Amino acid sequence: VSDMRTEEEQVEALKNWWKENGKSLVLTLALALAVIFGWKAWQNNQRITAENAGTMYQNLVQAVQLASAPQATDDQRTTAAHLAKSLKDEYGDTAYARFGALFSARLYVDKGDYEAALNELDWVLAQSEDSVMKTVATMRKARVMAAMGDADKAITLLDGLKEPSFSVSVAELKGDLYLAAGAVDKARAAYQSAAADAPQGARPLLNLKLDSLAAKGS
């Protein structure tokens, strides 16, 4: 451009450049705008989805509280079950749905439908990548399996848990399952392991369980 001597030459050069590059420039800008607005639309959709899932989850929490009460009606139990299913069906890729499935499993346990409870817990385990969520679901699955009379498999299931923040809870649960299965010595060892690592506030209950074993002369 510096070699050009007149404005007309500069204008003509710009025209020629535009003819050669204008269409690709417009296309590039259009694509860039589409990406920007598409990203914003996606973010907005994600926000709305999270808000709706959160609202449904809060409704589920309230419904489960009512459905779990001793005086709960069949309608209240049905409402809670419907909300849990809707949360999973409509927002299955959210954490709210996984928490909802945990509630659903609890409702099935209350009804004595252990197979359905296991299905809900297995769904949580399949959907979640979070180690804490997986640990919670696995511990609940172990309880359900023990209630079905399969304590040995339940304990084996617990052996695979490695989440450090749940080590005390897992050891205590093992003690409960061993005790229910009549393996008193193993129950005592599990309780002692839990008590050794437990925070101060959790020790009284563990000590009570150990004292109970001692009182039985075991």
Regions found by a protein language model. Name each.
Residues 1-31:
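N-terminal positive-inside, membrane-proximal cytosolic segments immediately preceding the first
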Residues 88-97, 125-134, 161-169, 196-204:
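Short solvent-exposed coil/turn linkers within tandem alpha-helical repeat scaffolds
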